[in-house]
Structure formats: C-alpha cells, structure tokens
Amino acid sequence: MSEVVIICSSSDPASSNIASRLLELAEWDEEGTLRFHRSYCMLCIEGELVGLRNLEDMLDRIGLSPRLIIFASRHISKEAVPWLGGHFTGVVREGSFELSRPAPYALKKLLMALQRHAPSTFRLSAEATHHGPVDLRTPSLFAEIGSCEQHWIDPAAGAAVARAILELESYEAHADETVLLGIGGGHYVQRQTELILSRPVAFGHMFSKYQASMLNVEAIKKAADLSGASGVYLDGKSFRSDERRRLEEIAASLDLNVMGIKEVRSL
C-alpha cells in the first residue's frame, strides 16, 4: 500500500526537477505511469497542480488511498529570491473560504529536513495558506522551489526538496507536539517558521495579516478542526488592538488557547 503519494507536473520545471532527483536518490519500481519506492508512490500529471479537483477520487480509482499527499511544485515571486519551503492549501475571501486538510507534523519535518539539505544560498520558510487544491480530505502540503526559472531547475535545490520528501515517511515522530493555527505575519510567516524549527510545536493552517480580516468564526473553526489545533498563535506585531480583540474573542468562543510568541517559545 502506498501511504505517501507525491504528485508532480510535467509542465512545471521545478516539479520535474524534484521528480528527477527523487528518481536518482531512490530505487523505484515502475508500474505504468506510477513509480513506487517503499511506502511512496510518485505520479506525474500534465497541467497545473493548483487547479486540481476531485484528486482523491482519481487516486481511489487507481487503487491509492494515501495518508499524505505531497505536491512538488515551483514557487513564483517577483523578487526572484532563491527559496525553499512549503505550505498548505486553501482560499480565504471576504465572506467565503475553502480549505484542504493540512499536515502539520509533515510540514514541520519537511522544514527541518530542508534546513539540513538546502544549498546555502537558498532561504527557507513556510508560507501562509494559499491557492488550491481546496477540496482535499487527506492531509497534504506543497513542497516548493522558488522563485524563478534559474532556481526551479537548480539540481541542488531539487535534490534538497527530494531528500526532504524522502524523510516524510516518519513524520508522525512529532505527533506528541502541540498543533496551533497561525494568524499574522507576512506571506512567508517568518516567526511561525522560527517556532516550527526551534520549539516542540507544529502549525496547521497559517494565515497572513493580510488574510486576518477575512477570517470569521466559521473559517477559524474549520481551520482548527482540519488542523487538529488546540490553540491559536497571534503574531503580536500584525494587528491593531480592535482586530486582535476580535480574533481573541473568536478563539475563546471556540475554546482555543490564544498564544503569543513568548508563550510559544516557553513550550
């Protein structure tokens, strides 16, 4: 049984780079369009990963019922900074939201592995939840290379992400750690990344300060339930007092413990 499914796209140069490095780093058995290694299955598709719908139905039809789905992908940024990282998927808009199930412990292990394997010129971080797929019931994450063509095809960057992915079989090793939602910070959620890498804590869905005003009680409840979160980290530098109070009141109504950076660092 393949417990971890890796989805790659032939139209994405970073995804193809990661797939090539995975094939080099491990021995894979080929069955049609699928590749198998231990409990991993790698599937390459055509087209964009972010627009996939009903992926689990397609996987079920070919006999795959994974416990974790990993999307190997490029990351695009106007700044063209060399970057490695990962994030969960979902879209939050004013008055509506769609969220897939995140994999908090897998993202933590991915970032810890990338910290060891990343080329020295590449920055590392998680990102706030964004884009699709938005309908996944299986825990999932994106593992990415950024931020331009030069970086997407860099073999060392591809190898770093591939090595990190190959360490995710045992991501439950962190399953006794506290899981929090994260709200605040920029898109690259630097303080949440620091906490993930330094403290016995994992993060489920993370939302930037730019998304915070669109989070209502239903969105936060859904994010917490999907993440298995027992609390909410609120980034202290991100909110006016009235906005922070609104978020604290929502968290209290959902019995979620509100924590700042000092409280999380003390864990």
Curated annotation (Swiss-Prot):
Keywords on record: Hydrolase, Metal-binding, Zinc
Cofactor note: Binds 2 Zn(2+) ions per subunit.
UniProt cross-references to InterPro entries, sorted A to Z: Deacylase_DtdA_archaea (IPR018033), DtdA (IPR007508)
Keyword Translocase among UniProt keywords: no
Catalytic activity field: a D-aminoacyl-tRNA + H2O = a tRNA + a D-alpha-amino acid + H(+); glycyl-tRNA(Ala) + H2O = tRNA(Ala) + glycine + H(+)
Pfam families: tRNA_deacylase (PF04414)
GO BP: any one term: D-amino acid catabolic process
EC number: 3.1.1.96
Cofactor: Zn(2+)
Single GO MF descriptor: zinc ion binding
Uppermost EC category: hydrolase
SUPFAM superfamilies: AF0625-like
Function: D-aminoacyl-tRNA deacylase with broad substrate specificity. By recycling D-aminoacyl-tRNA to D-amino acids and free tRNA molecules, this enzyme counteracts the toxicity associated with the formation of D-aminoacyl-tRNA entities in vivo.
Family named by the database record: Belongs to the DtdA deacylase family.
Subunit text: Monomer.
Protein name: D-aminoacyl-tRNA deacylase
Protein source organism: Methanothrix thermoacetophila (strain DSM 6194 / JCM 14653 / NBRC 101360 / PT) (Methanosaeta thermophila)
